[in-house]
Amino acid sequence: MKIVLVFVCTLYLAQATYLSEQDVNEVSEFLEALDQANEAASEMVEAAETEEARDWECLPLHSSCDNDCVCCKNHHCHCPYSNVSKLEKWLPEWAKIPDALKRCSCQRNDKDGKINTCDKYKN
């Protein structure tokens, strides 16, 4: 009787493992398809932004910038951590602030009043 019980448990475990492997395969196939769709969408967005940049002769969205004039008309140069440089003189010598925190980038104009103030885009 014990042998039959062990055999049935083994079959059940094998069946459960097989179903789990099928589920894992289906999920991995779905994730691969999702990654491909995401890549295609991001390529389309990049192409559109590059075309916009060519039309305006300006930097596309999320490019590094120094001022509003290098960004496109509907973008502005945003420096989220512009005050970080002022903190550097107060930090000990061993503490370094990464350059990524000092980086400014072209961002979309928003409703909060953050707009491109460059003279060449004013009408």
From Swiss-Prot:
The keyword Transmembrane does not apply. Expressed by the venom gland. Keywords: Calcium channel impairing toxin, Disulfide bond, Ion channel impairing toxin, Knottin, Neurotoxin, Secreted, Signal, Toxin, Voltage-gated calcium channel impairing toxin. GO terms for cellular component: extracellular region. InterPro entries: OXYTX_ICK (IPR044061). Residues 17-54 form a propeptide. Mass spectrometry data suggest a carboxylated free C-terminal residue. It is found in: Secreted. Residues 1-16 form the signal peptide. Residues 55-122 form the Oxytoxin-type inhibitor cystine knot (ICK) domain. Disulfide bonds join 58-72, 65-77, 69-118, 71-106, 79-104. One of its GO terms (molecular function) is toxin activity. The presence of a 'disulfide through disulfide knot' structurally defines this protein as a knottin. The primary structure of the mature peptide is identical to that of omega-oxotoxin-Ol1a from Oxyopes lineatus (AC P0C8M0). Weak blocker of vertebrate P/Q-, N- and L-type voltage-gated calcium channels (Cav1 and Cav2). Is both paralytic and lethal when injected into lepidopteran larvae. Is not toxic to mice. Belongs to the spiderine family. Spiderine subfamily. This is Omega-oxotoxin-Ot1a. It comes from Oxyopes takobius (Lynx spider).
